Design a protein with these regions (language model features):
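Active-site loops and adjacent core secondary-structure elements that bind or stabilize anionic groups
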Residues: 1-199, 215-233
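Gly-rich Lys/Arg/Thr-decorated short loops/hinges at beta-loop-alpha junctions or inter-strand turns
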Residues: 22-34, 109-115, 188-209, 286-309, ...
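Conserved helix-loop functional segments at active or binding sites
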Residues: 52, 228, 265-269, 354
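Flexible, glycine/charged-enriched surface loops at secondary-structure junctions
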Residues: 56-64, 164-167, 231-238, 268-279, ...
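A structural signal for short secondary-structure junctions
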Residues: 56-57, 111-114, 227-229, 329-332, ...
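Active-site-proximal loop/turn and secondary-structure-junction residues that shape catalytic pockets
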Residues: 69, 125, 238-241, 343, ...
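Glycine- and Gly-Pro-enriched alpha-helical subdomains that act as flexible
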Residues: 71-111, 243-342
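C-terminal binding/interaction regions
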Residues: 121-122, 135-165, 170-172, 188-189, ...
Length: 393
């Protein structure tokens, strides 16, 4: 198949629409559904991310994409009881495989943003992964293969219209890529930089020069995630998964704040009072996610006001005070942070420190690098200048 006709482009008025190959066959097979233009943009960007994560770490990888940027990305490390609970996978009746764990982490880190996502899996989608996917609101999945059991489960999702794409894992695109804007063709070499190259962590200008193996893995995960995130972008990572991604901001500090706030929410979801909220029986997953997000945030009265809390809880829970939130967030440590370009000011490090960041990888090259280094030294943060910019547009 050289081309595939689509219903429309980015918007319903943008017709006709198709994907096609100028040379050779499309490296995909649609096994279920009818993916759209944006679905394919998410699918092909997310597939590159998980393929590179698998190559770099040797671990199964998964990503959750929305509007051509990742909401989550992770490798297949086992879930502890706390993460299984906050990702709502503690009730699964069969053991979770490594690829299922990767998906649970990628989907679970920022559940609000992942609602209606497109999923990418580096490895064959098995039954456990398909069972997790089936219960979530999602547009589709791309993977190199599917077991028969998994495919049967996915084909039942959304009354048989769920988008399932199989991609040839051996496919490699041409070294030159092109796109058109306003009728003008842009051409560039593909971004083939290897982000697991040990040389990226050789230029360490900070007093603390120690990067444990886990931190290096997490920084590689952050950098690969940023490679496929709309710029400007910043990514916080802990224990093999992105916990906060700030994408598409014109200001670097706003990226760092946005991603840091997401990381804080991820950590606050593990607070005992949040994990034990007395939800009414049968509450929908999306309503539970939204209620938790409001309860943690500044607008908690939206779900705690008289006449409102009864819709969500069997009894009215006491909100967390600002002091309680700060005390809990202060317990989060060992976080790694990647940036797709240099930090122009030390304020990014100040904000990152508040969310438990102890390791940073960024391009370096700012006229104020000395200020950024001094701020890292102030908190004992280890920072590497990679010399690699990762803009993505």
């Amino acid at each position: 198949m050289k081309e595939l006709q689509l219903k429309y482009g980015c918007n319903p008025n943008q017709k006709p629409s198709r994907i096609f190959m100028e040379e050779g066959e499309l490296p995909i097979e649609v096994l279920s559904g009818r993916p759209g233009y944006i679905n394919f943009l998410d699918a092909f960007n997310s597939w590159q991310l998980v393929r590179e994560l698998k190559e770099a770490t040797g671990l199964p990888a998964a990503a959750s994409f929305k509007h051509v940027s990742p909401a989550g990305a992770a490798v297949g490390l086992p879930l502890d009881d706390t993460l299984a609970r906050i990702y709502f996978v503690d009730d699964v009746q069969i053991p979770l495989s490594p690829i299922a764990c990767a998906y649970a982490r990628a989907r679970g880190a920022d559940r609000m943003s992942s609602y209606g996502d497109f999923i990418a899996l580096s490895d064959t989608c098995d039954l456990a992964t398909a069972m997790l996917i089936k219960r979530e609101v999602s547009d589709g999945v791309i993977a190199p293969d599917y077991t028969e059991e998994a495919l049967q489960v996915l084909r039942e999702k959304r009354k048989g219209t769920y988008n399932v794409i199989k991609i040839d894992p051996a496919y490699r695109p041409a070294p030159i890529e092109r796109k058109q804007v306003f009728g003008i063709t842009f051409e560039q070499g593909r971004n083939e930089v290897r982000l697991d190259d040990p040389s990226l962590f050789q230029n360490i200008p900070t007093q603390n020069k120690t990067f444990p193996d886990e931190a290096r893995r997490d920084l590689i995960l952050a950098l690969i995630t940023l490679k496929y995130t709309q710029s400007n972008s910043v990514c916080y990572v802990k224990s093999g998964q992105a916990i906060g991604i700030g994408a598409g901001q014109q200001s670097r500090i706003h990226c760092t704040r946005l991603a840091g706030n997401k990381a804080d929410i991820w950590w606050l979801r593990q607070h005992p009072r949040v994990m034990n909220l007395p939800f009414v029986p049968g509450i929908r997953r999306a309503d539970r996610d939204n209620t938790i997000d409001l309860f943690i945030g500044e607008d908690y009265m939206d779900v705690l006001a008289e006449g409102e809390w009864q819709k969500f809880f069997t009894e009215r829970p006491e909100p967390l005070t600002r002091e309680e939130k700060r005390a809990w967030i202060a317990q989060n440590t060992g976080v790694s942070l990647g940036s797709d370009a240099f930090f122009p000011f030390g304020d990014n490090v100040e904000r990152a420190h508040k969310s438990g960041v102890q390791y940073i990888a960024q391009a370096g090259g700012s006229v104020r690098d000395d200020h950024v280094i001094d701020t890292c030294d102030k908190y004992g943060i280890a920072m590497a200048f990679t010399g690699v910019r990762l803009f993505h547009h």
